[in-house]
Protein backbone atom coordinates (compact mmCIF):
# COMPACT_ATOMS: atom_id res chain seq x y z
CA UNK A 1 0.00 0.00 0.00
CA UNK A 2 2.85 2.37 0.80
CA UNK A 3 3.58 5.03 -1.79
CA UNK A 4 4.48 8.62 -1.16
CA UNK A 5 2.02 11.28 -2.20
CA UNK A 6 3.54 14.10 -4.23
CA UNK A 7 4.29 17.12 -2.04
CA UNK A 8 2.57 19.99 -3.81
CA UNK A 9 3.79 22.40 -1.14
CA UNK A 10 7.44 21.34 -1.07
CA UNK A 11 8.84 24.69 -2.19
CA UNK A 12 6.59 26.53 0.23
CA UNK A 13 7.61 24.43 3.20
CA UNK A 14 11.31 24.21 2.41
CA UNK A 15 12.01 27.91 1.96
CA UNK A 16 11.74 28.94 5.60
CA UNK A 17 15.21 30.14 6.54
CA UNK A 18 16.85 28.39 9.45
CA UNK A 19 14.07 25.86 9.92
CA UNK A 20 13.98 22.42 8.38
CA UNK A 21 10.43 22.35 7.10
CA UNK A 22 11.12 20.34 3.95
CA UNK A 23 8.43 17.64 3.71
CA UNK A 24 11.21 15.03 3.78
CA UNK A 25 11.83 16.04 7.42
CA UNK A 26 8.34 14.86 8.40
CA UNK A 27 8.44 11.80 6.15
CA UNK A 28 11.72 10.73 7.78
CA UNK A 29 10.32 11.24 11.28
CA UNK A 30 7.52 8.80 10.50
CA UNK A 31 9.74 6.34 8.63
CA UNK A 32 12.19 6.24 11.55
CA UNK A 33 9.33 6.14 14.06
CA UNK A 34 10.66 9.34 15.65
CA UNK A 35 7.19 10.46 16.62
CA UNK A 36 7.50 11.75 20.15
CA UNK A 37 4.75 14.21 19.20
CA UNK A 38 2.32 11.28 18.88
CA UNK A 39 0.36 10.72 22.08
CA UNK A 40 -0.51 7.17 23.09
CA UNK A 41 -3.97 8.18 24.31
CA UNK A 42 -6.60 10.80 23.47
CA UNK A 43 -5.41 14.25 24.47
CA UNK A 44 -6.70 15.04 27.99
CA UNK A 45 -7.39 18.65 27.03
CA UNK A 46 -9.59 17.49 24.15
CA UNK A 47 -11.47 15.13 26.45
CA UNK A 48 -11.95 17.82 29.09
CA UNK A 49 -12.83 20.78 26.89
CA UNK A 50 -14.38 19.48 23.66
CA UNK A 51 -17.88 20.16 25.02
CA UNK A 52 -17.09 23.89 24.82
CA UNK A 53 -17.65 23.68 21.05
CA UNK A 54 -21.31 22.71 21.61
CA UNK A 55 -21.26 20.46 18.54
CA UNK A 56 -24.01 17.86 18.26
CA UNK A 57 -23.17 14.23 17.58
CA UNK A 58 -23.13 13.41 13.88
CA UNK A 59 -21.44 16.69 13.02
CA UNK A 60 -18.12 16.79 11.15
CA UNK A 61 -14.88 17.81 12.90
CA UNK A 62 -11.75 18.84 10.99
CA UNK A 63 -8.38 17.87 12.49
CA UNK A 64 -5.51 19.54 10.57
CA UNK A 65 -2.08 17.83 10.55
CA UNK A 66 -3.67 14.91 12.33
CA UNK A 67 -0.99 12.21 12.05
CA UNK A 68 -2.43 9.01 13.48
CA UNK A 69 -3.72 10.70 16.61
CA UNK A 70 -6.00 8.73 18.91
CA UNK A 71 -8.06 11.90 19.14
CA UNK A 72 -9.66 10.72 15.89
CA UNK A 73 -10.70 7.44 17.52
CA UNK A 74 -12.09 9.38 20.48
CA UNK A 75 -14.17 11.64 18.23
CA UNK A 76 -15.46 8.76 16.10
CA UNK A 77 -16.34 6.70 19.16
CA UNK A 78 -18.50 9.55 20.41
CA UNK A 79 -20.53 9.71 17.24
CA UNK A 80 -18.79 12.47 15.32
CA UNK A 81 -17.67 12.39 11.71
CA UNK A 82 -14.04 13.37 11.21
CA UNK A 83 -12.01 14.95 8.42
CA UNK A 84 -8.26 15.30 8.66
CA UNK A 85 -5.26 16.49 6.69
CA UNK A 86 -1.81 14.94 6.98
CA UNK A 87 1.42 15.13 4.96
CA UNK A 88 2.69 11.65 5.83
CA UNK A 89 1.03 8.80 4.01
CA UNK A 90 2.74 6.33 6.33
CA UNK A 91 0.99 7.95 9.31
CA UNK A 92 -2.38 7.55 7.63
CA UNK A 93 -1.71 3.96 6.63
CA UNK A 94 -1.01 3.24 10.30
CA UNK A 95 -4.09 5.20 11.36
CA UNK A 96 -6.45 3.12 9.24
CA UNK A 97 -4.78 -0.13 10.31
CA UNK A 98 -5.10 0.81 13.99
CA UNK A 99 -8.74 1.79 13.47
CA UNK A 100 -9.39 -1.51 11.69
CA UNK A 101 -10.67 0.29 8.59
CA UNK A 102 -10.04 -0.33 4.90
CA UNK A 103 -9.99 3.04 3.13
CA UNK A 104 -11.17 3.92 -0.33
CA UNK A 105 -8.48 6.08 -1.93
CA UNK A 106 -9.17 8.73 -4.54
CA UNK A 107 -6.92 11.36 -6.10
CA UNK A 108 -8.38 14.82 -5.55
CA UNK A 109 -6.34 17.63 -7.04
CA UNK A 110 -2.80 17.36 -5.67
CA UNK A 111 -3.76 15.25 -2.65
CA UNK A 112 -5.39 11.89 -2.02
CA UNK A 113 -8.62 11.42 -0.10
CA UNK A 114 -8.70 8.30 2.11
CA UNK A 115 -12.23 7.55 3.27
CA UNK A 116 -14.03 4.95 5.41
CA UNK A 117 -16.82 4.89 7.99
CA UNK A 118 -17.36 8.60 8.75
CA UNK A 119 -13.66 9.38 8.27
CA UNK A 120 -12.03 11.36 5.44
CA UNK A 121 -8.29 12.09 5.47
CA UNK A 122 -6.61 14.29 2.86
CA UNK A 123 -3.08 12.98 2.41
CA UNK A 124 -0.63 15.60 1.14
CA UNK A 125 0.08 19.27 1.67
CA UNK A 126 -2.66 20.99 3.66
CA UNK A 127 -2.16 24.11 1.53
CA UNK A 128 -3.35 22.05 -1.46
CA UNK A 129 -6.65 21.26 0.29
CA UNK A 130 -9.41 23.61 -0.83
CA UNK A 131 -12.74 24.50 0.74
CA UNK A 132 -14.50 22.53 -2.01
CA UNK A 133 -12.37 19.42 -1.41
CA UNK A 134 -12.84 19.54 2.34
CA UNK A 135 -16.57 20.05 2.22
CA UNK A 136 -18.73 21.11 5.14
CA UNK A 137 -17.13 21.01 8.57
CA UNK A 138 -18.90 22.02 11.76
CA UNK A 139 -15.84 22.60 13.96
CA UNK A 140 -12.05 22.51 13.93
CA UNK A 141 -9.83 20.83 16.50
CA UNK A 142 -6.25 22.10 16.17
CA UNK A 143 -3.82 20.54 18.62
CA UNK A 144 -0.84 19.88 16.39
CA UNK A 145 -1.06 22.13 13.34
CA UNK A 146 -0.52 25.76 14.33
CA UNK A 147 2.38 24.79 16.61
CA UNK A 148 3.98 22.73 13.83
CA UNK A 149 4.55 25.75 11.59
CA UNK A 150 7.37 28.26 12.05
CA UNK A 151 6.39 31.88 12.48
CA UNK A 152 6.93 32.64 8.78
CA UNK A 153 4.13 30.26 7.83
CA UNK A 154 1.64 30.65 10.66
CA UNK A 155 -0.12 33.67 9.17
CA UNK A 156 -0.61 31.85 5.88
CA UNK A 157 -1.76 28.71 7.66
CA UNK A 158 -4.35 30.44 9.86
CA UNK A 159 -5.77 32.35 6.89
CA UNK A 160 -5.96 29.13 4.88
CA UNK A 161 -7.59 27.19 7.71
CA UNK A 162 -10.16 29.91 8.31
CA UNK A 163 -11.05 29.88 4.62
CA UNK A 164 -11.30 26.14 3.98
CA UNK A 165 -13.20 25.51 7.22
CA UNK A 166 -15.54 28.43 6.45
CA UNK A 167 -14.86 30.14 9.78
CA UNK A 168 -16.14 27.17 11.75
CA UNK A 169 -15.69 27.30 15.54
CA UNK A 170 -12.39 25.99 16.76
CA UNK A 171 -10.85 24.34 19.80
CA UNK A 172 -7.21 25.39 19.64
CA UNK A 173 -4.35 24.10 21.78
CA UNK A 174 -0.99 25.88 21.69
CA UNK A 175 2.36 25.59 23.40
CA UNK A 176 3.95 28.59 25.09
CA UNK A 177 7.61 28.55 26.16
CA UNK A 178 10.93 30.37 25.74
CA UNK A 179 11.75 29.64 22.09
CA UNK A 180 15.44 30.35 22.71
CA UNK A 181 15.66 27.22 24.87
CA UNK A 182 14.58 24.83 22.13
CA UNK A 183 14.14 24.77 18.39
CA UNK A 184 10.69 23.73 17.25
CA UNK A 185 8.60 22.04 16.22
CA UNK A 186 6.49 22.27 18.23
CA UNK A 187 6.87 26.04 18.21
CA UNK A 188 5.86 28.49 20.89
CA UNK A 189 2.79 30.54 20.03
CA UNK A 190 2.04 33.39 22.41
CA UNK A 191 -1.44 34.45 23.43
CA UNK A 192 -0.83 37.76 21.67
CA UNK A 193 -0.06 35.91 18.45
CA UNK A 194 -3.27 33.88 18.70
CA UNK A 195 -5.18 37.17 18.86
CA UNK A 196 -3.20 38.53 15.93
CA UNK A 197 -4.17 35.59 13.73
CA UNK A 198 -7.79 35.13 14.71
CA UNK A 199 -9.30 38.15 16.49
CA UNK A 200 -10.61 39.71 13.27
CA UNK A 201 -12.74 36.66 12.47
CA UNK A 202 -13.46 35.09 15.84
CA UNK A 203 -14.43 35.92 19.38
CA UNK A 204 -11.64 34.31 21.39
CA UNK A 205 -11.99 32.83 24.86
CA UNK A 206 -9.01 31.59 26.83
CA UNK A 207 -10.25 28.42 28.51
CA UNK A 208 -7.34 26.87 30.38
CA UNK A 209 -3.60 26.55 30.78
CA UNK A 210 -1.64 23.57 32.06
CA UNK A 211 2.05 22.98 32.68
CA UNK A 212 3.78 20.41 30.46
CA UNK A 213 5.14 17.77 32.84
CA UNK A 214 8.93 17.69 32.58
CA UNK A 215 8.93 20.46 29.99
CA UNK A 216 9.10 20.04 26.23
CA UNK A 217 11.64 17.36 25.32
CA UNK A 218 13.07 17.86 28.80
CA UNK A 219 14.57 21.16 27.67
CA UNK A 220 12.04 23.94 28.09
CA UNK A 221 9.43 24.61 30.77
CA UNK A 222 6.20 25.02 28.84
CA UNK A 223 2.46 25.49 29.09
CA UNK A 224 -0.34 24.18 26.93
CA UNK A 225 -3.00 26.81 26.42
CA UNK A 226 -6.56 26.02 25.36
CA UNK A 227 -8.62 28.46 23.31
CA UNK A 228 -12.21 28.50 22.10
CA UNK A 229 -12.81 30.41 18.88
CA UNK A 230 -16.36 31.28 17.88
CA UNK A 231 -17.27 33.13 14.69
CA UNK A 232 -18.20 36.78 15.18
Each predicted region: which residue ranges?
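Class I SAM-dependent methyltransferase "Motif I" SAM/SAH-binding loop
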Residues: 62-67
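Class I (Rossmann-like) S-adenosyl-L-methionine-dependent methyltransferase catalytic domain
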Residues: 21-55, 68-72, 84-119, 123-133, ...
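A short, conserved alpha-helix within the catalytic core of class I
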Residues: 148-160
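A short acidic, Gly/Pro-enriched loop at the edge of an enzyme's catalytic core
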Residues: 132-140
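Nucleotide donor/acceptor-binding cores
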Residues: 58-60
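Basic polycationic patches enriched in arginine
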Residues: 3-4
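Gly/Ala-rich phosphate-binding loop of Rossmann-like dinucleotide-binding domains
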Residues: 76-77
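Short, Lys/Arg-enriched N-terminal segments with co-localized hydrophobic residues
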Residues: 7-20
